[in-house]
Amino acid sequence: MDNLLRHLKISKEQITPVVLVVGDPGRVDKIKVVCDSYVDLAYNREYKSVECHYKGQKFLCVSHGVGSAGCAVCFEELCQNGAKVIIRAGSCGSLQPDLIKRGDICICNAAVREDRVSHLLIHGDFPAVGDFDVYDTLNKCAQELNVPVFNGISVSSDMYYPNKIIPSRLEDYSKANAAVVEMELATLMVIGTLRKVKTGGILIVDGCPFKWDEGDFDNNLVPHQLENMIKIALGACAKLATKYA
């Protein structure tokens, strides 16, 4: 047990150069059955790890849980032990409800740092930016599958339920043309840059936080679009695994 990573509970030798990360451990199970084959590795707390085999390539799929503090633990253990590329595939809310609807897919090139962890690692002026090769590969995989996607900036916020004491800033970010909101991508991008690990993100919309009171939210993601997001992410991981082995 001593040679296992403290939280992921896998060994350094089991970490692949390319890793696909998701928030929900249940989504790991949905992803692994799309692969050609897989090997279950570990499940500790919110961190479930599976070795995936897809299109002749091997890479991990690991869940990181909800929010910046827990996901940072996952990302640090991956980055410090051999990961070279990490892609986050997750859900998000639309900040442009007239354009980006529930079930749409967004590939993000950068994120707004409304988390806390990244500000404890580097000054607030430091950007949260993904790697262009990862971003480009995700977009090309979407094109190959004939799946339309949006591109844009995500707001990564530690706050899910707002309080009246301090107003949410999502309206401001919407006016500034940020595309979507989620909770972990900025943390990944900052840690990736600091650790010289390439990062990227692909997200599926579950609703719009501005319209929750109108019923614009469904935790059961649009099934065929969830499948499309998974296939895009897996395809990108396979392509990148040939380059960053």
Swiss-Prot record:
Organism in which the protein naturally occurs: Plasmodium falciparum (isolate 3D7)
Consequence recorded when altering V66A: No effect on catalytic activity towards inosine. Slight increase in catalytic efficiency with 5'-methylthioinosine as substrate
Protein name: Purine nucleoside phosphorylase
Effect of substituting V73F: Loss of catalytic activity towards inosine and 5'-methylthioinosine
Catalytic activity: inosine + phosphate = alpha-D-ribose 1-phosphate + hypoxanthine; guanosine + phosphate = alpha-D-ribose 1-phosphate + guanine; 2'-deoxyguanosine + phosphate = 2-deoxy-alpha-D-ribose 1-phosphate + guanine; 2'-deoxyinosine + phosphate = 2-deoxy-alpha-D-ribose 1-phosphate + hypoxanthine
Protein residues bound to a purine D-ribonucleoside: H7, M183, E184
The enzyme's E.C. designation: 2.4.2.1, 2.4.2.44
UniProt-annotated catalytic positions: D206 (proton donor)
Chain residues that bind phosphate: G23, D24, P25, G26, R27, R45, R88, A89, G90, S91
CDD domains from the UniProt entry: UP_EcUdp-like
Outcome after substituting Y160F: No effect on catalytic activity towards inosine. 14-fold decrease in catalytic efficiency with 5'-methylthioinosine as substrate. 20-fold decrease in catalytic efficiency with 5'-methylthioinosine as substrate
GO biological processes: inosine catabolic process; purine nucleotide catabolic process; purine ribonucleoside salvage; uridine catabolic process
InterPro entries assigned: Nucleoside_phosphorylase_d (IPR000845), Nucleoside_phosphorylase_sf (IPR035994)
Superkingdom: Eukaryota
Disruption phenotype: Severe growth defect in host erythrocytes which is rescued by the addition of exogenous purines. Loss of purine nucleoside phosphorylase activity.
